[in-house]
Design a protein with these regions (language model features):
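Sec-dependent bacterial lipoprotein signal peptides
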Residues: 1-21
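Short, low-complexity N-terminal intrinsically disordered segments enriched in polar/charged residues
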Residues: 21-44, 52
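Short solvent-exposed beta->alpha transition segments
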Residues: 32, 47-95, 99, 105-108
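Exposed beta-sheet edge and beta->alpha loop/turn motif
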Residues: 93-149
Length: 149
């Protein structure tokens, strides 16, 4: 193999690695943006906006969550001076799916039937996202739940 061929092959490999890295960074940013927007809308009970960031099969879980929110829950949330905030802790992308670990602060925790929710200072949750075409969407297979404090 000549020096010229070696240089061309090396250049092609470096270019391929750069291209793959750029795609990965683009996906990371898109996953983070979708997950954070979903979390901020979901935990601030802007469920219509949250549903726009979900796969079609996730709508039933958004509707179920909405159907279980009482006026007492809304009153507790409206009494707060600060809204819920979400920070992304970790993203793991595997092809057209991604798993996100998120920290949520100052959110309404509704975990008891027949009793108004209560404010939670901080909790963690996990989301799964799927890539549909060029768009990342949250793919719920149940209610979004707090996994730990």
């Amino acid at each position: 193999m000549s020096a010229k061929q070696t240089i061309l092959i090396s250049f092609a490999l470096v270019a391929a690695l750069c291209l793959a890295s750029a795609c990965s960074l683009k996906d990371d940013a898109a996953v983070e943006s979708c997950a954070k927007s979903f979390g901020q809308n979901y935990f601030n009970l802007r469920l219509q906006q949250a549903s726009g960031l979900c796969t079609d099969r996730s709508y039933k879980w958004i509707e179920f969550h909405a159907s279980n929110i009482s006026q007492g829950d809304v009153d507790v949330l409206n009494a707060q001076t600060d809204s819920a905030l979400c920070d992304i802790d970790d993203i793991d992308i595997d092809g057209d799916s991604a798993r996100v670990k998120m920290t949520v602060r100052n959110f309404l925790l509704c975990d008891s039937i027949g009793r108004p929710g209560r404010m939670c200072k901080q909790g963690k949750c996990r989301l799964t996202l799927r890539k549909e075409g060029e768009t990342w969407k949250v793919d719920l297979d149940g209610l979004v739940t707090k996994t730990e404090e």
